Amino acid sequence: MSTDADSSEEPAGRVKISDVARHVGVSIALVSLALNDKGRVSEKTRDRIRAAAKELGYEPSKAAASLRTGRSHRIGFLLAANVERDWSEQWYSMTSQLLMDVVNVSTRLGFSVIVLPNNPAKNSIAELDGLVVSDSLTTDKSIATATALGVPVMTNERPDDSMVAVNVDSGYRAMTRAALDHLRERGAKHPALLTEPLGLHSNELAEKEYLTWCAEFGLEPVVARGRHDRSDLSERIDELLETDCDAIYSFYEEGAEIQEHIRSRGLRVPDDISLVAAAPYSDDINREAGVSTTVYHPDQMVDAPLTALVDVIEGRVTPPVTVHTPWEFVIHRSS
């Protein structure tokens, strides 16, 4: 679990909010809400947390406490940093659609939306009732800052992070395992993973599931990581084809392009190499090319999760909350 909350809010040697959470056996998010008199926390639990904080000698940051006052009916949307500038068109297209969905749902629920830059100032976060962070970078400290200020956070693919009030499970782990199990059932003995760079929690979660799966079957992992902008996709496919892999699960949605490149190397799909690609939404190009696809739904990542975040803000639900969004496995002739 990330320890950014500890390093960003408390000097070395002082009792940290994570120490209180560990002592009571609850999440950091719940401790933060209890100590800031926010959210739905039973009096019994709130008393236990306060007693533990007193017993351990925990002293909240005075600066943070002075920043956090009342309700603003504002939800922050963190504009994540573009990890590769030449991928900006696709990155901002995805972000823009997500922002529109956040604005529409927030308005319906009686909240306005404030767009924040990457790594915003603490006082900007303190003015919010909640924070939405999409596909967070592993280096981002905003979630830790928000939690320390008592601002509940909604993000995705961080299932074991106690700083997150609402986690959206888009199916990355389940899709990865389903694809690998399917490839094995169809005769593949050594599936490889074609994925994007480390640094995004979603990518790392899927890769971790692949590594776990390989360990379960005693297989040596074969992973190729390409750029977000796809500029080295051909090279990464060739990298995998030089190994002994007989199947590929790709987190690049360009399944048809990958299949065509494999065939250009004189290999048959699926006879020599089986292929499954992950893609947002149902993909006509992959379907027409006969590429098996695990399909996830970014359009489902806002309504129910943001409603849950507002429930946390208004005390109707106790964090942490996990919202599962749908996914499906569409099998075609490539596997």
Predicted regions and their residues:
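Short beta-strand segments enriched in small/hydrophobic residues
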Residues: 30-32, 67-87, 130, 182, ...
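Hydrophobic alpha-helical segments within soluble ligand-binding/sensing domains
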Residues: 167-193, 230-238, 295-314
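Amphipathic helical "hinge" segments at domain boundaries
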Residues: 56-122
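Flexible loop/turn connectors
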Residues: 238-335
